[in-house]
């Protein structure tokens, strides 16, 4: 144990040296057991450059739990079980005591309260309490993942940052009144093409991210260049962002190669005025100054680090997220999830009692959960002939254009040269065929793997009603017509255009949709 403590401390020492060498601002988030350790206190007070930041890391250990007068339930002083290591495992009153204990100790040591607090996940009650009482300005949580370390966060705002709902910190809010005014930045830098499908068919996903310990991702210069090209140089709407770094539990010997490669790259991009390097607190303050509600953002990846020709575009707003994927000569909407601030977290009022936590949003298209092997779920464009037969269309050579700060246009052609345009707005998306071929007959068609349970309850001409985890929601067709599957059909529903255009509203506000949870 003594050697483990030494390795953890050595890692932070080396990280401090590295950011100081390049005079970069950095944020060090301290778990309570590190906060009360004089070694870390002295190091960060005396060695860290003065434009860096010290904040809180909200993974709960025995010293903090016992300082709050709560019985420790773990077999060791640190465990990864969600109902012990995270705030979701405690009552609301206990969550507040845990915050008060940490804040008091932090102020005793550093003379002020932390502005930034991060974790793999912080529940809405805790985060709201941190803001209401201590006025934190920024938070961060884990990238989307399924089952990794026992933690599932799926369907959320992909990359960048969002204001969370007061009743569900994973769910972006739609209104100022319904949000916690603390932006949550998504950590770790997911591979825009490959992270989503990793581990499909297995109990948990692997990791393909900017984290410097991963040989085929954040440790690989080619992958880092590929990732940063998407973040720095491609269309992104309001802004783009990535978090670089690694928790010290991975130790310096495992992260040094990747981190010592990444930091000079970031420093060079900063000197070229292509990026700003900021503390988490600075980014949070900037976000709050610029955005009263969650903005629309995008991540555009049109080159493939693996040389397979795959491409992807992510769009996020406070109402929904959507993902387009070009893969192995095919094209589809791989993902669409709606956001609704009224969808309460299961952990809002009561503690979780298992070693996992699960957070979801409202699925419309789920290319991971509804796929099996090579049978990939997605919303595809199909051409229909007079006999009722169909042909899946592949849109290729995409051109991605920003129209203002909240509208993204993706233009592409099918194999016969028919142009299509997909436009993402904050509240809706549109798919239009621009072909001069007046009788071009096409549709959007949702297909999923056999045997997958879907949330759709009633399919109407203008709406698909759905229910997920007891919460009702609706996908509304503003232009076009929705068709139920016919007997023997291989699709879940089909959307036909009107005047060669389909418009889908993603605000979940149709009057006859009663939300219950």
Residue ranges and their predicted role:
Residues 2, 10, 14-17, 22, ...:
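Catalytic grooves of carbohydrate-active enzymes
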Residues 288-326:
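Surface beta-strand/loop "capping" patches
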Residues 32-121, 179-208, 236-250, 366:
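Metal-dependent polysaccharide deacetylase catalytic core of the NodB/CE4 family, i.e.
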Residues 91-166, 427-431, 467-469:
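Catalytic domains of cell-wall/extracellular-matrix polysaccharide-remodeling enzymes
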Residues 1-50:
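Active-site beta->alpha N-cap acidic-glycine motif
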Residues 324-407, 414-416:
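Acidic-aromatic substrate-binding/catalytic surfaces of carbohydrate-active enzymes
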Residues 406-455:
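Acidic, contiguous internal or C-terminal segments within carbohydrate-active enzymes
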Residues 214-223, 240-245, 467-517:
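Beta-strand-rich recognition/accessory modules
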